[in-house]
Curated annotation (Swiss-Prot):
Matching PROSITE patterns: TRYPSIN_DOM (PS50240), TRYPSIN_HIS (PS00134), TRYPSIN_SER (PS00135)
Record-linked SUPFAM superfamilies: Trypsin-like serine proteases (SSF50494)
Similarity remark: Belongs to the peptidase S1 family.
GO MF, one example: serine-type endopeptidase activity
Function, as annotated: Protease that shows specificity similar to chymotrypsin.
PANTHER family: PEPTIDASE S1 DOMAIN-CONTAINING PROTEIN, POLYSERASE-RELATED
UniProt GO cellular component terms: extracellular region
Compartments (UniProt record): Secreted
Secreted found in the keyword field: yes
EC class (word): hydrolase
Keywords of the record: Allergen, Disulfide bond, Hydrolase, Protease, Secreted, Serine protease, Signal, Zymogen
Designated name of the protein: Mite allergen Der f 6
Active site: 94 (charge relay system), 140 (charge relay system), 233 (charge relay system)
């Protein structure tokens, strides 16, 4: 039976403060049997990140951010995201659903998960798409406003939203600090990247349509050996000309996914909403 992931959040207090991945901390991919979707009968499933990827230089993704969650006496990586203006980050709604802005921070200007010479910025308002529902995959996007604008530099740059058509067969790249092994527990310290190929929505819907219909606000990508899952949520999928093409949203329970596509929110489709809320 086909299983897919949807995301829920569960915070569990624990005394673990080392580099091990706290599975209970992050928005967790959970599986739903095909005949249950999109109901909220959720169960745990193994989680993963940019599986099969490689280290990414900061120059490749100076727009990448780490969304951090206050966790006991420290901050822990929860999701990825992209700077789209000096004061605005775009990420996935499932990363911020139910979260208080006061408990979140943004780390930027680094490809090292655990350090940045720029410091971390507390999150100001969270602007979640008004149509988003926790147990569904549509409108999976949130805008985060920073209290102070970042200063653009070699290491800190904004990512422009891709407005050109991205079609079946186009090459794209995913970035993130998610787990690199579906059965692992350790997050990589260095940003990872993975190459994927766009799959047209019609073909993607042939795989997913009976479980969760693919609509124009989604974009699909596939590589049988590389993919993004938990820990990469909210992070960027970029086109060959380095523009923001997708926001990591959901995918199959197996990582890497084999013949099932990873599914991303398509920023171009929601450009009016993003433009209205950008600072």
């Amino acid at each position: 039976m086909i299983k897919i992931f949807l995301v829920t959040i569960l915070i569990v207090i624990t005394v673990t403060v080392d580099a091990r991945f706290p599975r209970s901390l992050q928005p967790k991919w959970a599986y739903l049997d095909s005949n249950e979707f999109p109901r909220s009968k959720i169960g745990d499933s193994p989680i993963a990140g940019v599986v099969g990827g490689q280290d990414a230089d900061l120059a490749e993704a100076p727009f990448q951010i780490s969304l951090l969650k206050d966790y006991l006496i420290m901050k822990r990586h929860m999701c990825g995201g992209s700077l789209i203006s000096e004061s605005t980050v775009v990420t996935a709604a499932h990363c911020t659903y139910g979260q208080k802005a006061s408990s979140l921070s943004v780390r930027y200007g680094t490809n090292q998960r655990t350090s940045s010479s720029y410091g971390d910025l507390k999150v100001k308002p969270i602007i979640q798409h008004e149509s988003y529902e926790q147990d569904q995959t549509q409108t999976d996007k949130t805008i985060i406003i920073l209290p102070n604008p970042v200063v653009p530099s070699t290491n800190v740059q904004m990512n422009e939203i891709e407005t050109e058509d991205i079609v079946d067969g186009d090459k794209v790249t995913i970035y993130g600090w998610g787990l690199t092994d579906g059965n692992g527990k350790d997050l990589p310290d260095k940003l990872q990247k993975g190459s994927m190929t766009i799959v047209g929505n019609d073909r993607c819907n042939e795989k997913w349509g009976s479980i969760n219909a693919i609509h124009p606000g989604m974009i699909c990508a596939l590589d049988k050996t590389q993919s993004g899952c938990n820990g990469d949520s909210g992070g960027p999928l970029v086109s060959a000309n380095r523009k923001l093409t997708g926001i990591v949203s959901w995918g199959p329970s197996k990582c890497p996914p084999g013949e099932y596509m990873s599914v991303f929110t398509r920023p171009k489709y929601y450009l009016d909403w993003i433009t209205k809320n950008i600072v």
